[in-house]
């Protein structure tokens, strides 16, 4: 796959994630869009690592760290969403005003 195609795919995934993050009213959908943004960043890291320095694996190792961070973020985010849903009976963003009380 050519370098430009991979960059176009990464920008496309990033823009879909940003659009979904801005327009979503559901917290689960916002979390999925955030994961999509992180995956597009990983795609860029691996692509530029392969293009500029293919013998060293700095970009690939950093991408593995980002994947581990995304997994931890998803686990914590889903547990918080589960707690919010249990207490508020809704996962809509505009209905969760946890800082008012």
Curated annotation (Swiss-Prot):
EC numbers for this chain: 7.1.1.-
Catalytic activity: a plastoquinone + NADH + (n+1) H(+)(in) = a plastoquinol + NAD(+) + n H(+)(out); a plastoquinone + NADPH + (n+1) H(+)(in) = a plastoquinol + NADP(+) + n H(+)(out)
TM region positions: 2-22, 32-52, 61-81
Compartment(s) of residence: Plastid, Chloroplast thylakoid membrane
Record key words, sorted: Chloroplast, Membrane, NAD, NADP, Plastid, Plastoquinone, Quinone, Thylakoid, Translocase, Transmembrane, Transmembrane helix, Transport
InterPro entries, A to Z: NADH_UbQ_OxRdtase_chain4L/K, NUOK/Mnh_C1-like
Membrane topology: Multi-pass membrane protein
Gene Ontology molecular functions: oxidoreductase activity, acting on NAD(P)H, quinone or similar compound as acceptor; quinone binding
Source organism superkingdom: Eukaryota
An example Gene Ontology biological process: photosynthesis, light reaction
Main localisation: plastid
This protein's GO CC annotations: chloroplast thylakoid membrane; NADH dehydrogenase complex
Family statement: Belongs to the complex I subunit 4L family.
UniProt subunit comment: NDH is composed of at least 16 different subunits, 5 of which are encoded in the nucleus.
Function description: NDH shuttles electrons from NAD(P)H:plastoquinone, via FMN and iron-sulfur (Fe-S) centers, to quinones in the photosynthetic chain and possibly in a chloroplast respiratory chain. The immediate electron acceptor for the enzyme in this species is believed to be plastoquinone. Couples the redox reaction to proton translocation, and thus conserves the redox energy in a proton gradient.
Annotated HAMAP family: NDH1_NuoK (MF_01456)
Protein name: NAD(P)H-quinone oxidoreductase subunit 4L, chloroplastic
Species per Swiss-Prot/TrEMBL record: Hordeum vulgare (Barley)
């Amino acid at each position: 796959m050519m370098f430009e195609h991979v960059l176009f795919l990464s920008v496309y995934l990033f823009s879909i994630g940003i659009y979904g993050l801005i327009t979503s009213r559901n917290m689960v959908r916002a979390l999925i869009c955030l994961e999509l943004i992180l995956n597009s960043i990983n795609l860029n890291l691996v692509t530029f690592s392969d293009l500029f320095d293919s013998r060293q694996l700095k970009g690939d190792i950093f991408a593995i760290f980002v994947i581990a961070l995304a997994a931890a973020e998803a686990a914590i985010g889903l547990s918080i969403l589960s707690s919010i849903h249990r207490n508020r009976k809704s996962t809509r963003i505009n209905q969760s005003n946890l800082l008012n009380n």
